[in-house]
């Protein structure tokens, strides 16, 4: 018997022993077909962000972290993702640890608030236990936790003001993520943790910025996205929105360090039409000659506003352009694992 045959026989015996002890499917090969399966995703609601993520959206069965400064658009970005999930017939949950969810604003972004699962927990432990229950149900597609900084440990809430609680929140996050990641992968749920930026004390060289909750989330997150406000959008003297830039600083499902820029309009969120128009020009799908915009040889408007108005009046063209820009045409289903025959 050759060495290869002996190895295969030993592997088959080991697999049979493992499955006898832990159940069928404990050990498996991915198989030839599974290697070619696309990553199942949830659209972010932003064409640019979907493109920057490299797979067309937030990956299912993974942990995602969105962090940034105050009023940079973190919650708005996640509410757009919730609206996308609901539009596709999925179920979404919002763990409002900050107790600051604006229901009327969420409705303006397309969220069906009457169908949204909302929890406003009293402690960090309660928030993460609720999250675990929702994940293990296998019925929730997207869970947003807003925010890590507001996941206050029970010991801190029950203690006196001014008491020192060094590392309690970091230990809480580390324990929770150890329990959650396996269940998240099996259920296909995507969890988005919103996080805040803090400044390290005494840093003389390098970046003094860090995120709350310790290092566990940095390790367990498959995708980490930094969102920053880069400027204001004015209508005359009135500020009507802000410009935002998203940078994918960590990505386990595609090449990292991709960026996306978009306009956040007050009261309506991401300016999708303007984003598709700008990216269409950047990718060559829309031709721009002087102030004129053309699509496949047909002139659609003079000036950005008129071209955007034309796209707004043709939603089917807008949707098709968005899919061409991101390179995706449909939501892939979760790949089925292939078991090893004993």
Swiss-Prot record:
**Other comment:** There are two genes for RecA in M.xanthus; recA1 seems less functional than recA2.
Q: Which keywords fit this entry according to its UniProt record?
A: ATP-binding, Cytoplasm, DNA damage, DNA recombination, DNA repair, DNA-binding, Nucleotide-binding, SOS response
Q: Which Pfam families match?
A: RecA (PF00154), RecA_C (PF21096)
Q: Which family does it belong to?
A: Belongs to the RecA family.
State the protein's name.
Protein RecA 1
- GO terms under biological process: DNA recombination; DNA repair; SOS response
Example GO CC term: the record gives: cytosol
InterPro entries cross-referenced by the UniProt entry: AAA+_ATPase, DNA_recomb/repair_RecA, DNA_recomb/repair_RecA_CS, P-loop_NTPase, RecA-like_C, RecA-like_N, RecA_ATP-bd, RecA_C_sf
**Main localization of the protein?**
cytoplasm
Where in the cell does this protein reside? Cytoplasm
Functional description taken from the UniProt entry: Can catalyze the hydrolysis of ATP in the presence of single-stranded DNA, the ATP-dependent uptake of single-stranded DNA by duplex DNA, and the ATP-dependent hybridization of homologous single-stranded DNAs. It interacts with LexA causing its activation and leading to its autocatalytic cleavage.
In terms of Gene3D superfamilies, this protein maps to: P-loop containing nucleotide triphosphate hydrolases
Instruction: List the molecular function annotations (GO) for this entry.
Output: ATP binding; ATP hydrolysis activity; ATP-dependent DNA damage sensor activity; damaged DNA binding; single-stranded DNA binding
Task: Report the domain of life of the source organism.
Answer: Bacteria
- Can you tell me which residues bind ATP? 68-75
Keyword DNA damage listed: yes
């Amino acid at each position: 018997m050759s060495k290869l045959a002996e190895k295969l026989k030993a592997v088959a015996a080991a697999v049979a022993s493992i499955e006898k002890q832990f159940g069928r499917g404990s050990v498996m090969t991915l198989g030839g077909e599974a290697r070619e399966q696309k990553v199942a995703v949830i659209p972010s609601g932003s064409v640019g962000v979907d493109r920057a993520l490299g797979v067309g959206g937030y990956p299912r069965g993974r942990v995602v972290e969105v962090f940034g400064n105050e009023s940079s658009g973190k919650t708005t970005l996640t509410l757009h993702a919730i609206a996308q999930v609901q539009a596709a017939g999925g179920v979404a949950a919002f763990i409002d640890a900050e107790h600051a969810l604006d229901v009327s604003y969420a409705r303006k972004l397309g969220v069906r608030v009457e169908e949204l699962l909302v929890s406003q927990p009293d402690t960090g432990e309660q928030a993460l236990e609720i999250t675990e229950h929702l994940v293990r149900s296998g019925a929730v597609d997207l869970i947003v936790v807003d925010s890590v900084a507001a996941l206050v440990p029970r010991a801190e809430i029950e203690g006196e003001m001014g008491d020192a609680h060094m590392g309690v929140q970091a230990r809480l996050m580390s324990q929770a993520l150890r329990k959650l990641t396996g269940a998240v992968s099996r259920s296909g749920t995507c969890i988005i943790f919103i996080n805040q930026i803090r400044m390290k004390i005494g840093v003389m060289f390098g970046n003094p910025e860090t995120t709350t909750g310790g290092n566990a989330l940095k390790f367990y997150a498959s995708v980490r996205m930094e969102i920053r406000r880069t400027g204001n959008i004015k209508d005359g003297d009135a500020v009507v929105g802000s410009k935002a830039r998203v940078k994918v600083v960590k990505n386990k499902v595609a090449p990292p360090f991709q960026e996306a820029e978009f306009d956040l309009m007050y009261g309506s969120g991401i300016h999708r039409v303007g984003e598709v128009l700008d990216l269409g020009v950047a990718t060559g799908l829309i031709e721009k000659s002087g102030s004129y915009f053309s699509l496949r040889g047909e002139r659609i408007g003079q000036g950005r506003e008129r071209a955007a108005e034309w796209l707004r009046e043709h939603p089917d063209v807008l949707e098709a352009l968005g899919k061409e820009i991101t390179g995706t045409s449909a939501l892939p289903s979760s790949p089925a694992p292939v078991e090893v025959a004993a």
